[in-house]
Regions:
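Catalytic-site microenvironment of enzymes
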Residues: 1-222
Length: 222
């Protein structure tokens, strides 16, 4: 029920948010906006009084940020410029996350979450992209999602639930290629034990970075 409510929030921003987001309609491909070193937006989901999923002492907003910090550190080590939508435990509205991404002139955005379901048997990784009517944006986002999924599965050995289309605000209303990664189910006991291990989060982060690099490589001719 909690996850359903949170998904509805992602799908249907408030009227104030919607008014702000209507400004952002033009897609900017990575090739057009990256003159040199690529800039990447990393979006740790939830924060502040928005906990996301909570199972025992494991809170999604905390794991989202921890994983995002690992991703950011690896990207910076590889020479990328990184912009985080939040760097600490604070609430950031969906509209503000989208605004930041759209003003950043970044190459792409990755939003990081962990999953929940009523069924305790649900497990595995999901990556979402928006099925945009603008074919170029849809193709870029799907390509990014496919590559990230490939590398993440290789490193984590997790089950794949596939690359899917989604109508989440943070991937729908951004002007750059954007994906939302669900790194596993906190409601599955076996998967929760893995997620609680730091090495799993580091492997997940490395897979995300490897996928980003593979996506950007042909654009930079390297």
């Amino acid at each position: 029920m909690v996850r359903l409510f949170l998904h509805l929030v992602f799908l249907f921003p408030t009227s104030g948010d919607a008014a702000r987001l209507r400004k952002h309609t033009n897609f900017k491909s990575a090739q057009k906006i990256v003159p040199g070193r690529a800039k990447i937006v990393i979006d740790p989901g939830h924060g502040g009084d928005d906990f996301g999923t909570k199972v025992g002492h494991t809170i999604e907003k905390v794991i989202n940020l921890k994983t995002a910090e690992y991703v950011a550190a690896l990207l910076r080590k590889s020479g990328f410029e990184v912009l985080m939508t939040r760097k600490k435990d604070v609430f950031i509205s969906l509209a503000d996350r989208v605004d930041l991404a759209n003003r950043s002139k970044a190459s792409l955005m990755v939003s990081i979450h962990f999953n929940a379901a009523q069924s305790k048997e649900a497990e595995g990784l999901e990556i979402f992209y928006f099925k945009d009517p603008i074919l170029e944006r849809k193709n870029h986002s799907k390509n990014l999602a496919d590559l990230v999924m490939r590398f993440v599965l290789n490193l984590t050995k997790a089950k794949s639930r596939g690359v899917k289309t989604g109508n989440f605000c943070v991937i729908r209303d951004t002007q750059i290629p954007s994906i939302l990664v669900e790194g596993g189910f906190l409601t599955n006991e076996r998967e929760l034990e893995k997620i609680r291990q730091d090495q799993y989060l580091r492997s997940l982060a490395q897979g995300i970075v490897d996928g980003i690099e593979a996506y950007l490589k042909p654009m930079h001719g390297s």
